[in-house]
Regions:
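Bacterial Sec-dependent N-terminal signal peptides
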Residues: 1-25
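Low-complexity, acidic/polar, glycine-enriched regions of mature
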Residues: 20-184
């Protein structure tokens, strides 16, 4: 009887572990270019150090990007970004917490491209806003990539842009995110 109970307990534990599958990655890349003329890269920046988690069973996703990991071609711009605009000592991270709509775990078992949407909350510069954007999920081999493009307005996140710089920047800043999860 003990062996049957032990086997049943082990079986339930394994089933729960499989169903509660969670993927984690440190391969989350975020790029933005706030220039009015997108061909100019004066203020463009990228972080390749975001961390993301995907809970397969619940379709929940979370992303954390340390703001000091955004690097610019100009050291002075990077200093202004961290100290004067984003106040990264006070607000060190940008985050997203939400769910993927149109996602199911069976999609991870076969190569393909799937159009999903994400809905949740973005926190940037200490301000949290509701967020919704389309997401392209690409499953290929032993990895899944989530690509998302969206725009934000600096003033929506209480980010003050000085008058001298403001004419050079777009009202809405385009942001591109690419998150790659290894499928183990």
């Amino acid at each position: 009887m003990k062996k049957i109970l032990l086997f049943a307990f082990f079986f339930i534990l394994v089933v729960n572990l499989i169903n509660a599958q969670t993927y984690k990655t440190r391969d989350a890349n975020i790029y933005f270019n706030p220039n009015k003329d997108l061909s100019h890269k004066d203020y463009a920046s990228q972080s390749k150090e975001g961390t993301a988690v995907l809970k397969v069973e619940t379709s929940e996703v979370a992303l954390l990007v340390p703001m000091k990991t955004f690097h610019f071609n100009n050291a002075l711009l990077e200093e202004h970004f961290n100290e004067n605009y984003l106040h990264t000592n006070k607000f060190p991270n940008a985050t997203f917490k939400g769910k993927l709509t149109g996602f199911n775990k069976d999609q991870l078992t076969k190569d393909g491209i799937y159009n999903l949407s994400s809905e949740g909350q973005v926190t940037l510069h200490g301000v949290t806003k509701d967020f919704k954007a389309p997401v392209k999920m690409t499953v290929k081999g032993k990895s899944v990539t989530f690509d998302c493009s969206f725009k934000i307005k600096a003033e929506d996140f209480a980010i003050d842009i000085p008058g001298l710089v403001k004419p050079k920047l777009a009202d809405l800043t385009p942001i591109d995110a690419a998150i790659v999860f290894p499928l183990n």
